[in-house]
Amino acid sequence: MSLWKDIKGTILPFWVTLRYLFRRPVTVCYPERKQTPAPRYRGRLVLTRDPDGEERCVACHLCSAACPVDCISMQAAEREDGRRYAAWFRINFSRCIFCGLCTEACPTLALQMTSEYELATRELLQVIYEKDELLIDGCGKNAEYNFYRRAGIGVVAPRGANPGESSPEDVKSNLP
Amino acid sequence: MNDTLLTLILIVIKLGLVLGTVLTLAAYMVLAERKILGRMQMRYGPNRVGWGGMLQPLADLIKLLCKEDLIPQRADRWVFMLAPAISTITALLAFAVIPFGAPLQLFDRSLPMVICDLNIGLLYLFALSSLAVYGVALGGWASHSKYALLGGLRAMAQMISYELAMGLAIVPVVMTARSFSLTAIVEAQQSLPNMLRHPLAFFIFLVAIMAESKRTPFDMPEAENELVAGFHTEYSGMRFGMFFVGEYLNLIVLGSMLTVLFLGGWYGPLLPGICWFLIKVLGVAFFFIWVRGTMPRLRYDQLMAFGWKILVPLGLLNILVTAAWLIWRG
Ligand code: SF4
Ligand code: SF4
């Protein structure tokens, strides 16, 4: 009986492959037919602005610390009013593995992922993006969040004046 | 004198035609295989170069020619360079004796549709397929790499074992045709192809040539998962290409052998002989591709056991039974 099973098990697959030969392929022919990635697709990174139109990035280096392949680099600088920003900001997309860890690490929601995936090029230097190429005009996925409005102490509002904050305690007043 | 010259010219023309057809066929066989396997797995296969991928073989050729041709530092240079040629040339030489059609009447003379009608054609074919083992074994040995060596060894053991079964399978065919000439063997099948007359021999031969062509499910020598790529691991560029083309040439040779020995050669209704021959060879090739798309790779010990413990005894038994039947019929 087992021999019969063996013979059947050998013959039957041939029928299966023959049937599949006449099925329509499921392949998506890419350059002709493009697919829209899911909203949370991890594509090219961008730097966003806050609702006031100012740069969100405060050059805290958290993203470059979180990046497993070390492809983000920047230099921090400070404006007159004490607001920090990145003097230059560089992402080397030829090394990026699009893991999204940098966006998780970013406390200001400045760094965000987009669904753009067509980065291929023959010029290696073209996939090293500088700040002016990364910085976009909008807020990205969160249109309300404004880091400096919440914690930008002494830059946007005096201490304790941000929404949901109480003014600082005068430590001298509660001495014994 | 004039007659000899004419014969010579005709032979050269035939040679050129056969060589051209066979090489083009081999190139497009690669494409066909990739496309058919693709469809069986619900993908398209190559479809970018030319019309629906029709120029893919050309693109492959250009790519192979432009690639760097490496020779490992401690390889045996000459053997390393010769091995792929042996593989390809043995396959090409086999076409010398394969008859493509019934003799043609031209210029008041009979023109045989075979380059050279040897009366020991079958033995010649077998001698060549034994030589083909050298290409693989030497390629594996000369590369100075463990993977290649193991692949070559496996290939050698497998090809020699199955060649035995192959030899035994055709003895009944020779006995009924009473000749070693391939033309005579085909002519003996005018009424009934050997496939129906000797079904067991047909089965043994089919399995044996599958093993001989080193394709799935008998692709032990190349077993990418275990051996990187087997005997041609160290080859690159056109040298690899020659092994590769050799494999497909071999596929056509074996398909032609199967056609000539068991499928009735050029005989068939309606169409001219040469068309039937081509249809049969392509059919066999399709079957091979189909098997490759269906069957998983065998285990090496199972492969050897199957060859020695099942095919060889069956082949011997088949010879005995055929002989007894022939004697009984007188
Ligand atoms: S997505 Fe991952 S690899 Fe790319 S920059 Fe961010 S952390 Fe680095
Ligand atoms: S992008 Fe975000 S994590 Fe990176 S430096 Fe700017 S604020 Fe910090």
Swiss-Prot record, chain A:
It comes from the Bacteria. It comes from Syntrophotalea carbinolica (strain DSM 2380 / NBRC 103641 / GraBd1). It catalyses: a quinone + NADH + 5 H(+)(in) = a quinol + NAD(+) + 4 H(+)(out). It is a peripheral membrane protein. One of its GO terms (biological process) is aerobic respiration. [4Fe-4S] cluster 2 binds at C67, C96, C99, C102. Belongs to the complex I 23 kDa subunit family. Signal peptide: none annotated. It is found in: Cell inner membrane. Binds 2 [4Fe-4S] clusters per subunit. Its cofactor is [4Fe-4S] cluster. Its EC number is 7.1.1.-. This is NADH-quinone oxidoreductase subunit I. PANTHER family: NADH DEHYDROGENASE [UBIQUINONE] IRON-SULFUR PROTEIN 8, MITOCHONDRIAL, NADH DEHYDROGENASE UBIQUINONE IRON-SULFUR PROTEIN 8, MITOCHONDRIAL. NDH-1 shuttles electrons from NADH, via FMN and iron-sulfur (Fe-S) centers, to quinones in the respiratory chain. The immediate electron acceptor for the enzyme in this species is believed to be ubiquinone. Couples the redox reaction to proton translocation (for every two electrons transferred, four hydrogen ions are translocated across the cytoplasmic membrane), and thus conserves the redox energy in a proton gradient. Residues 47-77, 87-116 form the 4Fe-4S ferredoxin-type domain. [4Fe-4S] cluster 1 binds at C57, C60, C63, C106. Keywords: 4Fe-4S, Cell inner membrane, Cell membrane, Iron, Iron-sulfur, Membrane, Metal-binding, NAD, Quinone, Repeat, Translocase, Ubiquinone. HAMAP family: NDH1_NuoI. GO terms for cellular component: plasma membrane. The keyword Iron-sulfur applies.
From Swiss-Prot, chain B:
Its EC number is 7.1.1.-. Its main location: membrane. The keyword Coiled coil does not apply. It catalyses: a quinone + NADH + 5 H(+)(in) = a quinol + NAD(+) + 4 H(+)(out). InterPro entries: NADH_UbQ_OxRdtase_su1/FPO (IPR001694), NADH_UbQ_OxRdtase_su1_CS (IPR018086). It holds the Pfam family NADHdh. The chain crosses the membrane at residues 5-25, 78-98, 120-140, 155-175, 191-211, 243-263, 271-291, 308-328. GO terms for cellular component: plasma membrane. GO terms for molecular function: NADH dehydrogenase activity; oxidoreductase activity, acting on NAD(P)H, quinone or similar compound as acceptor; quinone binding. The keyword Disulfide bond does not apply. It is a multi-pass membrane protein. Keywords: Cell inner membrane, Cell membrane, Membrane, NAD, Quinone, Translocase, Transmembrane, Transmembrane helix, Ubiquinone. It is an enzyme of class 7 (translocase). One of its GO terms (biological process) is aerobic respiration. NDH-1 is composed of 14 different subunits. Subunits NuoA, H, J, K, L, M, N constitute the membrane sector of the complex. Belongs to the complex I subunit 1 family. HAMAP family: NDH1_NuoH. NCBIfam families: PRK06076.1-2. This is NADH-quinone oxidoreductase subunit H. The lineage of its organism: Bacteria, Pseudomonadati, Thermodesulfobacteriota, Desulfuromonadia, Desulfuromonadales. The gene is nuoH.
